[in-house]
């Protein structure tokens, strides 16, 4: 399940906080970034408005992208991919030869991006990752040779799973913890990708957090957030898991700051400043609302979808750092690589798993893209701040009867009758289908 500003499918369990003109939905939520506003960055000038644990944007970086994109391509990516829900007219102004991008509202300063006159006059796009077309020649049996892939097993698992609310337990069986499941898939996927020629790196290789921070490091910030959002005397601790006001406690908010924001931003630092991959694969399992995790509701529902970055909300674009990150990502052309890649992986996963595509109940946060019917654009923290193409996989509903039975069966070699059907383990099926999709894409893109 998505682990930054939102949960993927369950919008029912949520608590609203209001601040200024923003509606904040916490827990299983649409967005929480406006929840923190500016109060967590006192060192910045009042004119700068940044998202949760974000940094002042370095707009000068965009100078490197001058004349690397035509007006038509820029307008297409803005209107059809990144800003499909619209944006305030003063944020981005697209003219014939330039685009003016607002740096911040208080100063009304803008960055001016110059367009290339045509495709032939475009300057090379500066980036550390390499699109498939620029990779060295490869042998047909090793379509991923020279490719640098970072595996990002979603969530934490282990002792952190209950805190993350990525944990459910049925009867006498072992608890199902998404962070454990995704790490298991990553460990199966890595040798498959290496056999195909890739260099593979783990962003998370254990059930311990990547960030050095812990919830206690965010208690004072959590207290300020709650006071700012109308809770004048916030309680320190949650009374019990069913506490109806747990979202209004310092403990609950400090935990979110730890596992949702600090953790993902630390993973991004590894991706952007150490690993420099050509591709990040975010591995997740999905879920529907399950109620009490000690007595969860099991369903017959099961589905698959993948995510790429895009579909920013108007409120999200009001944050200077999110607007900057969106424009930088657009100019890097990550979308041109990650969408066809996601489509190919989706087709391979659909073929292997026989799962139908997930259909979001609303289009308020997503935009369906591509040709497979399985891929959506959505503005997740990881897909936004990892500075390379990102394919975010969301197969299997963990609390479906069938998936739960397969998870309880564990990993095994070959085929086995599970829940009345002869099949691979769910972990091997996941790993095989992703590897097959990558092989298909890079074989085609590299002309093998």
List each model region and its residues:
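Hydrophobic h-region of N-terminal signal peptides that target proteins for export
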Residues: 36-46
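Arg/Gly-rich low-complexity intrinsically disordered repeat tracts
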Residues: 1-36
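Catalytic-site microenvironment of enzymes
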Residues: 46-448
């Amino acid at each position: 399940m998505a682990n930054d500003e939102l949960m993927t499918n369950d919008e029912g369990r949520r608590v609203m906080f209001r601040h200024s003109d923003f509606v904040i939905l916490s827990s299983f939520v649409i967005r929480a970034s406006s929840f923190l506003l500016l109060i967590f960055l006192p060192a910045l000038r009042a004119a700068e408005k940044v998202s949760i644990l974000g940094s002042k944007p370095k707009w000068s970086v965009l100078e490197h992208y001058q004349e690397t994109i035509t007006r038509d391509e820029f307008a297409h990516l803005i209107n059809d991919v990144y800003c499909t829900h619209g944006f305030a007219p003063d944020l981005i102004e697209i003219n014939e030869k330039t685009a003016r991008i607002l740096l911040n509202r208080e100063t009304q300063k803008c960055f001016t991006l110059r367009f290339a006159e045509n495709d032939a006059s475009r300057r090379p796009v500066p980036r550390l990752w390499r699109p498939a077309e620029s990779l060295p020649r490869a042998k047909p049996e090793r379509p991923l040779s020279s490719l640098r892939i970072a595996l990002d097993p979603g969530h934490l698992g282990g002792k952190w799973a209950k805190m993350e609310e990525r944990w459910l337990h049925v009867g006498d069986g072992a608890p199902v913890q998404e962070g454990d499941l995704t790490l298991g898939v990553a460990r199966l996927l890595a040798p498959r990708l290496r056999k195909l020629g890739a260099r593979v790196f783990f962003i998370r290789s254990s059930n311990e957090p990547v960030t050095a921070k812990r919830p206690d490091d965010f208690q004072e910030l959590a207290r300020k957030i709650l006071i700012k959002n109308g809770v004048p005397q916030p309680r320190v601790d949650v009374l019990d898991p069913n506490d109806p006001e747990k979202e209004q406690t310092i403990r609950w908010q400090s935990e979110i700051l730890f596992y949702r924001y600090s953790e993902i931003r630390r993973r991004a630092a590894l991706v952007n400043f150490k690993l420099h991959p050509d591709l990040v694969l975010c591995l997740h399992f999905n879920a529907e609302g399950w109620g009490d995790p000690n007595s969860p509701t099991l369903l017959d529902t099961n589905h698959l979808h993948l995510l790429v970055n895009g579909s920013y909300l108007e409120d999200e674009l009001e944050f200077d750092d999110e607007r900057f990150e969106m424009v930088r990502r657009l100019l890097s052309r990550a979308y041109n690589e990650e969408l066809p890649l996601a489509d190919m992986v989706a087709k391979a996963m659909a073929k292997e798993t026989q799962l139908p595509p997930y259909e979001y109940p609303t289009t308020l946060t997503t935009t369906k893209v591509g040709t497979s019917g399985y891929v959506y654009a959505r503005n997740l923290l990881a897909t936004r701040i990892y500075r390379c193409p990102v394919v975010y996989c969301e197969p299997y509903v963990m609390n479906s009867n069938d998936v739960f039975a397969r998870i309880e069966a564990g990993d095994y070699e070959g085929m086995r009758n599970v829940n009345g059907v002869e099949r691979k383990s769910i972990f091997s099926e996941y790993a095989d289908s992703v590897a097959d999709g990558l092989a298909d894409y890079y074989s085609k893109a590299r002309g093998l």
